């Protein structure tokens, strides 16, 4: 899943190489997600997009970059230890300054989800991580689950998204779960 492998392949392939998914980025998912958001909301510019969970890896990174480039307001709502890489955050803030987007990081769920247009989450344990991290992640990220309270704090028209596969749900909709 290494980004370096895709970059090396692209360097020597002699043909275009598309990054379907690496540990750092997931551009294929971005195309699908942005089309879905546009389909449901009618636009992308100015959309408040909240990512809840572990924002350090491919989904958090890709969503932050994509939102910055498309003029969307990105919020990583998670524990500080799961904030995205500072260097990438700085890059995204520079891009956001040119597109009218904004980039915010918060540990406060009420602040982060307030008036959100989109609330998005991902698996809490990423591909290739050892089983030993499960207990810590569940403890750390449980306050950042997308549930009824988080969705109620968003706009009434807000949509919930997940890049799949999603596991451990007790309800088919976050609007129904506690």
What are these regions (language model features)?
Residues 126-144:
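Glycine/threonine-rich flexible loop motifs
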Residues 150-157:
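Short, conserved loop/helix-junction motifs that constitute active-site signature segments
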């Amino acid at each position: 899943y290494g980004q370096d492998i895709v970059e090396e392949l692209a360097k020597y392939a002699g043909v275009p190489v598309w990054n379907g998914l690496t540990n750092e980025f997931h551009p294929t998912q971005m195309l699908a997600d942005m089309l879905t958001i546009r389909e449901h909301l009618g636009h992308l510019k100015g959309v408040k997009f909240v990512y809840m969970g572990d924002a350090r890896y491919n989904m958090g990174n890709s969503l932050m970059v994509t939102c910055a480039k498309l003029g969307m307001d990105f919020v990583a709502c998670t524990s500080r230890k799961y904030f995205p890489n500072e260097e990438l955050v700085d890059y995204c803030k520079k891009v956001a300054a040119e597109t009218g987007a904004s980039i915010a990081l918060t540990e406060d769920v009420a602040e982060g989800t307030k008036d959100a247009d989109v609330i998005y989450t991902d698996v809490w344990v990423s591909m290739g991580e050892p089983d030993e991290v499960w207990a810590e992640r569940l403890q750390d990220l449980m306050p950042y689950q997308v549930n009824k309270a988080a969705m109620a704090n968003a706009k009434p028209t807000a949509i919930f998204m997940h890049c799949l596969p999603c596991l451990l749900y007790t309800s088919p909709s976050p609007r129904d779960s506690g």
